[in-house]
Amino acid sequence: MNRYQEAGVDVNAGYELVKRIKENVKSTNRPGALGGIGAFGGLFDLGELKVKHPVLVSGTDGVGTKLLIAKAMDQHDTIGIDVVAMCVNDVLAQGAEPLYFLDYIATGHNDPAKMADIVAGVAEGCRQAGAALIGGETAEMPDMYDQDEYDLAGTVTGVVEKDDLLTSDQPQAGAILLGLASSGIHSNGFSLVRQILFKDHQVDLAATPAKLGGQTVGQAVLAPTKIYVKPVLPLLKDHLVEGVAHITGGGLIENLPRMFGDDLQAQVDSSAWPSLPVFDYLKELGGLSDDDCWQTFNMGLGMILAVQPDLVDQVKSRLNQAGEACYQVGQLVNRPAGEEKIVIK
């Protein structure tokens, strides 16, 4: 053992990790991706793209304290999907096609098997999004983190034709709001989730409450964030959608109004889509108010599209053909003076 290892950093574990992840990283390659693991920087050739006036759209995000659920379950192979989803769904909301992704893992101890599981999830997320995993960093920091702790973040870059960029001035009064089903909690609100499960109660993550329909609590809360790129991007390229909202921290109340201008109001019918069991379970167990839920969780909708009425049937049909559950959840109207930008009924 050398002095660096004595200090808590094992470079050989890093070399072992690179060997383990090489094939997963390679599986994400797409046109434009150059090189492979080992270069000083990730490379992407924009000349491969058929874009006349490209605008690059970048996003960075993490997974938050959902990582502590993964740690408690010792299940690390899906949390990477979450970090990709949080980033790619954000750039999709601007109209952009994800091109490439970079991940960052910080840990107290580089366990190659665990780190490889995390990267396998990142690679799976990249495949779902059509983005190349062109680089990343695993930082072993023994005095910053405990041995079994890690943090995970990522950055995506996407591209959109300048004329196709989605901005808040595009949605118009009369547009119909179509909600796309979430897969569960996604990656926001986990400080409240953990408060309910572990502090207010001592819930066993292996328990199967009746409200969860056969799922364990752990399975329900760790379900990976849905990636909407493949069903939604073709609709954007065909100019069938005039606004997209990614429903993340703050739920519909915070995120839906970001999609449109201050002169409009979103009127949302909360009975228009089915409630997910995980939210019913958390609401009852935690004694949460309706306001608590709407201000914290996605409540079953991970993305909302603004579509003109004459295009709604076509968009719904194409989403259904892509296997995407879609609900007509409301509309945009001219905002009455003094009222909020969103009303949920």
UniProtKB/Swiss-Prot annotation:
Pathway where this protein functions: Purine metabolism; IMP biosynthesis via de novo pathway; 5-amino-1-(5-phospho-D-ribosyl)imidazole from N(2)-formyl-N(1)-(5-phospho-D-ribosyl)glycinamide: step 2/2
Organism: Limosilactobacillus fermentum (strain NBRC 3956 / LMG 18251)
Molecular function GO labels: ATP binding; phosphoribosylamine-glycine ligase activity; phosphoribosylformylglycinamidine cyclo-ligase activity
Gene3D superfamilies: PurM-like C-terminal domain (3.90.650.10), PurM-like, N-terminal domain (3.30.1330.10)
Catalytic activity entry: 2-formamido-N(1)-(5-O-phospho-beta-D-ribosyl)acetamidine + ATP = 5-amino-1-(5-phospho-beta-D-ribosyl)imidazole + ADP + phosphate + H(+)
Protein name stated in the entry: Phosphoribosylformylglycinamidine cyclo-ligase
One BP term from GO: 'de novo' IMP biosynthetic process
Pfam families per UniProt: AIRS, AIRS_C
GO cellular component, one term: cytosol
Main location: cytoplasm
Signal peptide, first to last residue: none
Subcellular location: Cytoplasm
Sequence similarity: Belongs to the AIR synthase family.
EC assignment: 6.3.3.1
Record keywords: ATP-binding, Cytoplasm, Ligase, Nucleotide-binding, Purine biosynthesis
Superkingdom of the source species: Bacteria
